Amino acid sequence: MDKSISLRMMFCNVICTFLVILRHSLNLRAFFISETPANWNAIVQNGSMNITSIAVPFFFLMSGFFFFKGVDATYKDTINKIKRRCKTLLVPFLVWGAINTIILQVSDSCRYGLWDGLLFTHLWYVRDLLFFVLFTPFLAFLRNKATFILYLVLIALAILWQPVDSVFPSSEGMFFFTLGCTLRQNVLLRITCHSSMVFLVMLWLIIPFVYPIGQTIVWQKVYIFSGVLLLWILSQKMPQDINRLIKTVAPYCFFIYCAHLYVLKAIKVTLASMFRNNDAISLACFFLIPIIVTVLLLGIGVFLKKHCHTTFALLTGFRNLQYLKKNESTIL
């Protein structure tokens, strides 16, 4: 695979991992129990939810692309890749599902069932990805023998796509995973950054704070799809310093993604109970807690990899070794 594509995917992987954490940092209900405010704090946090909505679609897109790596694959190659995905996805899905179940049962066993920690937490992304991988032999056949039908399937999935959909199976996940499986390396390489893109990026960032995107599904789809495209375009202009930082953080993205939710929630709920109905603290926590959680879990990940390698391998589905060898994204 072209090294520039792998490097750009790493950049997008790190950005999207942080966006997921930022999305879960929404704290209006935690700080304001009786009535959610309708002020600048709410506008910033709710508007930011639209920006973060590109993260999971990009994860699915990236996972689909890396399955075929932009080239045609034989039936045998596809089956072998499914077996490898079962190792890198099913193992951490079960391990983290067990951890989530224990946390939920200890915190509130009356509210949560035994299966909730496995099926209905932020691991829904991994759950759906495992399901979508089963359809890759069919997608491989269409890629190789019936491209026109594959395009028709994509159009149908785009129509059926419900934005920010985590219900099994996710229509959003299916569309972007199939799109990723369809993309070829030469197409991604042709999407380059021009000076005019700066204006489009600024416009894209401002829109959700002045226009209620979520009221119309069509506009929501356009906003998410254009955001995914703009993120890929911007990835071409990484400074060298950012490039080095990305290479350091990327091997731990999957661990951070799986581990962040309850760490973030504990910090958020604790601070909310101490500073109830405080807009300034609420907004500060919204932006600062994701940074704190990311740095904290990055440190824990580095420690586990160095001193508890087997544990870290189980928590990440042994994908870290694959990453070091192939320089691929670790969210797959």
Show where each model-derived region lies.
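Alpha-helical transmembrane segments and their immediate juxtamembrane cytosolic regions
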Residues: 1-332
